Amino acid sequence: MTDDTAAPPPRGPARDWKSSPLVSGLLLGLFSLVSALMLALASDATRGPIAARSAEDLLASLAQVLPAALHDNDPTADIRTLADADEGAVRVYVATRGGAVTAVTFELTGYGYGGAIRVLMAVAADGTILGARVLSHTETPGLGDKIEIGKDDWIEGFAGRSLTDPGPAGWKVRRDGGVFDQFSGATITPRAVVGTIHRGLTLFDRHRAELLAPLPLRS
């Protein structure tokens, strides 16, 4: 075989472009970008309905503790935030009628047998409780869940109470020498709610002047 007819040197195996690290990195980046865009679009699509549902839930909760006759404003639009040394930042929904503050509503958290108990309470300008409701809890079904208005009317026993009715010694469950009933087989849960509502009255008393001050005029 002459030089002119010599066979070409053997060639190495052809590289598959799909296995290139550069291509793999580009594909991974493109996939991540598309996924992020899809998640952003989904978030935008659901944000509005979620916000609307939250606003509806808040209005429904306020209506359970705050009599409609006491306000001619929208308490969810007139909000004050208290900076309290014990409770931290507390969002307060202010009810007014004829420009005068008639009541305030706010949420505090206590801790029962099963964990956190969120309590919403409305307090009139004179310091009496207008109503209280448990918004969420993880207490034992059939025992501690009697703090729910749908399970028992126990929570309604706080309406009309104040820091002086009963006095300090009375703001306990009966087992501890107070005036509020406990549940059979469940004392920790009602004790936590009683304590939380008493804290709420104390919070109102500490910030009474600030809470009852006229709201700034809307521009």
Curated annotation (Swiss-Prot):
One of its GO terms (molecular function) is FMN binding. This is Ion-translocating oxidoreductase complex subunit G. The complex is composed of six subunits: RnfA, RnfB, RnfC, RnfD, RnfE and RnfG. Its main location: membrane. It is found in: Cellular chromatophore membrane. Part of a membrane-bound complex that couples electron transfer with translocation of ions across the membrane. The modification FMN phosphoryl threonine is found at residue 187. It is an enzyme of class 7 (translocase). Keywords: Electron transport, Flavoprotein, FMN, Membrane, Nitrogen fixation, Phosphoprotein, Translocase, Transmembrane, Transmembrane helix, Transport. Belongs to the RnfG family. It is a single-pass membrane protein. GO terms for biological process: electron transport chain; nitrogen fixation. The chain crosses the membrane at residues 25-45. Its cofactor is FMN. It comes from the Bacteria. One of its GO terms (cellular component) is plasma membrane-derived chromatophore membrane.
